[in-house]
Amino acid sequence: MSERAVGNEPGGGPGSVLVLGIDPGTAVTGYGVVARRGVGAVSLVECGVVRTSAGTPLAERLREIYLAVDALLVRHRPFAVSVESVFQGKN
């Protein structure tokens, strides 16, 4: 299941450089797409989360995350992608 919010500038507008940031996790993967035009301010294009069910096999969960990230790449065509370092621990 994906949840998303869209910023004020869909696609970032002409001349924008888009960057996709990903905060990975098997239960919840967060993401954000930001745009920067020239030396101007950075603006939010879209952000959200991809949630997977704990009872679902890992392979299926990874597939759901893959499909969601692939859709983001197709929709926004970012110039760069940044993935936060993964760590394992208990909350």
Language-model features: locations:
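Phosphate- and other anionic-substrate recognition elements at nucleic-acid/protein interfaces
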Residues: 1-91
